[in-house]
Swiss-Prot record:
The keyword Transmembrane applies. Keywords: Glycoprotein, Lyase, Membrane, Transmembrane, Transmembrane helix. It is an enzyme of class 4 (lyase). The chain crosses the membrane at residues 20-40, 50-70, 75-95, 113-133, 138-158, 197-217. Its EC number is 4.2.3.-. It is a multi-pass membrane protein. This is Terpene cyclase idtB. It comes from Claviceps paspali (Rye ergot fungus). GO terms for cellular component: membrane. Pathway: Secondary metabolite biosynthesis. The lineage of its organism: Eukaryota, Fungi, Dikarya, Ascomycota, Pezizomycotina. Belongs to the paxB family. It holds the Pfam family Pyr4-TMTC. Disruption phenotype: Simultaneous disruption of idtB, idtC, idtF and idtG eliminates the biosynthesis of the whole spectrum of indole-diterpenes reported to be produced by C.paspali, including paspaline, paxilline, paspalinine, paspalitrem A and paspalitrem B.
Length: 239
């Protein structure tokens, strides 16, 4: 995020903790890279996809925007985005394969999953670019990330409830995503506290509401995953 504030010299207070912020950025990248790698592995093993289609399109569109159109000047951020974008293309291919099986009850979707993913990604991509043109890439980066996170957390929770099955998900998938996102909250908090002239808006009511919503949704996901997993274990023991 500080990679989009090159016109502003960081204050001395922030420079002292920048190493910590960059460490959390790397932690964010590590968590999401593990999550993406596991999603690819699950997809290629024929398991259902664990990310709903719209959040998937939105994620890859956001990464396209801030890797290619508005690249960050922060090398750590840019490297994380580039790796995530590369892995997301493989995830997209895996999602297309999974959709043929998971959505076989809906031929319109299962037979045209690739086209739907492409159109969805282009729509989200143009939306992220338009937002950056409207309010500037620094703000759009953050608000776009908020939308991505909420769509993913809430979409994932309802996907788990709708399936009532652990197929396509695991504790490692959930925890890597959750910890990666918590690292995002941590480095954003450091920037807000030690560079308030640029990032003070991160303490706004809407951002705080988004933070609470994310924490509630992802915590609920963990609780529901435990309940579903426990029910599956009991069912297997009966048989």
């Amino acid at each position: 995020m500080d990679g989009f504030s090159i016109l502003h010299e960081p204050p001395a207070a922030y420079k002292e903790v920048k190493w910590m912020a960059d460490t959390f950025v790397a932690g964010m990248g590590l968590g999401w890279i593990v999550n993406y790698a596991l999603m690819i592995r699950f997809s290629w093993k024929g398991r259902p996809h664990c990310m709903a289609l719209l959040p998937l399109c939105n994620n890859i569109a956001w990464e396209l925007t801030y890797t290619i159109v508005y690249p960050s000047a922060n090398r750590v951020e840019l490297l994380v985005f580039a790796i995530g974008l590369t892995l997301n293309f493989f995830i997209m291919v895996g999602a297309r394969r999974s959709a043929r099986v998971e959505w076989r009850h809906s031929p319109l979707l299962s037979e045209h999953a690739g086209f739907i993913l492409l159109v969805g990604t282009l729509l989200c991509f143009t939306g992220h670019v338009a937002l950056a043109m409207e309010i500037g890439p620094g703000l759009a980066y953050s608000w776009g990330a908020v939308v991505c996170q909420l769509a993913l957390s809430i979409g994932g929770l309802f996907q788990l409830l709708q399936r009532n099955s652990t197929a396509g998900t695991s504790w490692t998938l959930w925890s890597s995503r959750f910890l990666g996102s918590c690292c995002t909250v941590a480095f954003a908090g450091l920037r807000c506290k030690y560079w308030p002239e640029v990032f003070g808006w991160l303490a706004s009511p809407l951002v705080l509401w988004s933070l609470v919503t994310f924490l509630l949704a992802d915590s609920a996901y963990g609780f529901c995953l435990y309940r579903v997993s426990h029910a599956e274990t009991k069912a297997r023991k009966k048989h």
